[in-house]
Amino acid sequence: THTACLSYEVLTGPPDRREQRARRLPEVSVINRENIAWLISFWGDDWPYDMVAVDEMSSFKSPTKRNKPTKKVIEDRTNEIVRALPRGLSSAEIEQKVTRELKKVRGELTRFGALCTVRKFISRFIGLTGTPAPNGLLDIWSQYYLLDQGRRLGTSFAGYRTRYFDGDYMGYKYTLKGGAFEKIVHQIEDITVSMRTEDFTDMPPLVYNTIKVRLPKKVMEQYKKFEKTMLLEEHDIEAVNAGVLTGKLLQLANGSVYDEEGQPIEIHDLKLDALERVIEEAAGAPVLVAYSYQFDLEKLRKRFKNAEVVGEAKNVVKRWNNGEVPILLAHPQSAGHGLNLQYGGCITVWYGLCWSLEYYQQLNKRLHRPGQTSTVFVHHIVAEGTADERVMRVLPEKNATQSALIDATAWVAET
């Protein structure tokens, strides 16, 4: 290929191996996202790379530069502060000084924050993603900041949000102002190229299907009461707020609910039964199954003894692509980016649904990608009358803005 003449190193493995390979300064250094902060810390102001290309750029969509300090960091720093205080202080004085010092404690840099510290040393920055705005155009600010250091969309996320969005009275939900979409596209179109796979490759069809399951009357009554009162009395489970309630309702739709101690309470097996029918109808064809919760995984492995899990064995992807894995279980968050699974099967089943459009689309594309020769089927097992149906409504709504952005910046091949 055209890159065969270049020298390269893969900066993975133990820190000493990474350091040794990094010091060789090949023409191309390849690193995973998890080690970016390490690489930046290693080089500091001696950063040697004048060009950076980031695959799956949307994984840098969070505009937060630092994570919140962990509980352990806070506890350790509190102990250090108290030990350093002079004797004889009152409890109120100690509390005041500790509070003041803790305000200075900062969490670790995020991926975005880490790259920001060395961006000034980079003359060319390229980002690639198939999901640039999975939750709307608020997602793109940090990605474009890394590309142009704020020249097009501004140097602060708050400023970008104020210029182009209107917030609700609580500041939780933001919607585009009139004409804002066109203004944003105008700002970024000179450095943005969108290419749809179907415009450049002959891809087989992608077919979406919904498989509905109906909860038994007693379970549905429990669900509705839980939804209304935020209390599942039969199992002494309480949802402390609307966000927790939504998660608990999705758990119940899947078949179990975590109690206050984090132990799963089994409610039903309807989704397992529906999945079993899909696998039987597949007549031996491999099936990729997306699950949501740990109890999902445990129930799936108990029901399907021949199932294997992405990430548990180093060669599981290779064996899947060789047709040696009949059922592959994957969590969307860990299997959504970068995996090539198109050679092993053409059936995906969403056993547990997810709110993230990015994870949803990325996992669907594990099978429907160049190299696939068969029609790809994506089945969704949906419990009727539950939060599952809400997820199925929300995902297309999220995709509308992203598709409009891709269309507005699309480059179509000449025919």
Residue ranges and their predicted role:
Residues 1-15, 149-150:
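Conserved helix-turn-beta segment of the N-terminal RecA-like "Helicase ATP-binding" lobe
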Residues 1-3, 134-139, 293:
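Conserved Walker A/P-loop ATP-binding site and its immediately adjacent core
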Residues 30-48, 73-74, 78, 107-123, ...:
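Inter-lobe coupling linker of SF2 helicases/translocases
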Residues 32, 61, 297, 307-394, ...:
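Conserved RecA-like P-loop NTPase helicase motor core
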Residues 55-56:
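Walker B catalytic acidic pair
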Residues 59-80, 92, 96-116, 357:
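Substrate-gripping "pore-loop 1 plus following alpha2 helix"
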Residues 286-293:
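Conserved RecA-like ASCE P-loop NTPase motor core of nucleic-acid helicases/translocases
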Residues 389-415:
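C-terminal or mid-to-C-terminal helical accessory/interaction module adjacent to the motor/catalytic core
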